[in-house]
Amino acid sequence: MENRIHRTEIQIYVSPFLIVIFLLMSISSNAQQIIAKQMPFLEQLPSNEVIDLHQDQNGFIWLGTKNGLGRYDGYQLQTFKSDFNQPHLLTDDFIWCFAEDDNCLLVGTRQGVNLVDKSNYQIRPFPDTEIQNTWINFMLVDSRKELWICTRNQVSHYNSDYSLKKRYGNLIPAVPNNGINSIYEDHFGNIWVCTWGGGLYKYLKNTDTFMSFPTLGANNNPFKIFQDKDDQYWILTWGDGIYRFHPDATEDRMYTHQEIFNEKLHQPETAFFSVVQDDVYGYIWIFGYHELYAFKVADGHLEKVDLSSYMFDYNKMFSQIIKDREGNLWAGAYDSGYHLLMGNPAIANNFLPKLKRHVGFDTNITTLGIDPNNGLWFNQERWGLCWYDIEQDKFYDYSNTNSGVHN
């Protein structure tokens, strides 16, 4: 086997939190390996009310709260908020949404957009003064590196240098309670907009306009649209449940309603607002108003996964769920949140006993790293650096001594 240590970028995490999680993932021989832990930095947050989360291109986890911005680097949390020393650091400390381009993290608040320079973490206001002092509902940097910013009832489209291309004013009627819920780019580069009370829209690039779709449910209130790994579309609504969406079908076959029943409340769940699909089991994880749900897709329909055996409270007041680049999930909530680690089923459950046989004494893993080539780097105390090939279920030694690798 060629020496992977010279050709692989390695992400190493020395946090004891992750080491404990790895050991827990090797306990059960039958259960699916999903481990839920409280977010490890809650006491450092400016507020436990986590509104939105984002993992940037460098791997940092950003958290938007009602009282400031946090950046987690795997060890500790750095906070950004206006105070008496820096009264205008952010245009507003109530963080609502994120987007990211090659140079900046874009932070949406109740008072416009802030640009966080990723090279030095200097913060400045977004140059378009028309949207400052405005609640930013949602933002998207698309595959063409163009920016879309949604405010109450309009969408603003920008070039990559933040110059305005076009403002789509009054996309929906400016009546009380109407607004833009979200904007989304699918796998084919199509841009979709979900609106409160105004229905679903698709951007038509050839005419530079938005096309509306037929009324959805009784309230015509799509909250999020999502395309799964098999390119199937799902629409989460606020008030009418979840629909399978067939964009090219006739109007009478365009929306297929999914029956989602809340056993605890003995009634259908009708309001949904955040969605992601994990890479390990292919479950679609969705936040409902009352509960966190996980679904399998079978014959084009959602089948509920029983989460009752997992040790976490899935009835929290959740806010946003995201997937990090290691395939694990982060679930923000208005009263803290969870880090859901998706155990790779390719890793044998007797990993630790095998390692003990390999080294000849008790295992004591002090450092873990995730290898993008489907493996794990780790340091075994009194042995040294090792690499575990998940596909081949083999260990490889990379230390010339048995003294170990010290942090």
For each of these PLM feature ranges, what is it?
Residues M1-N407:
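Carboxylate-rich, polar loop motifs that coordinate divalent cations or form catalytic acidic clusters
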